[in-house]
Amino acid sequence: MPAFAIGLYDIWDASWRPAYRGAVDKLVTKHGGRYVARTTNPWEVLEGAAPDITNITMIEFPSMEHARAWYNDPEYTPMKRLRQTGSRLDFLLVEGSS
């Protein structure tokens, strides 16, 4: 079953982004993932309060196992640290439907 990694970012210093994106894009592909959404564009809140975020990312993986393997890949660890220098992230992993 597919799985979706959903990132809700609050970015206050984007200087880390060029290095992060280049490396992480390769790791996403390595683990069978693909970006479904990656936006700083406006989004619409249909119900409830708008989260205090500046960016949303959604990555589809073939399975929860693929998504976890990507997130726990040792090559991703330094990228997580880099991202944390200029942002706060709430990251969710959601199993899709077949």
Where are these predicted regions, by residue range?
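Conserved, structured core segments of small domains
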Residues: 1-98
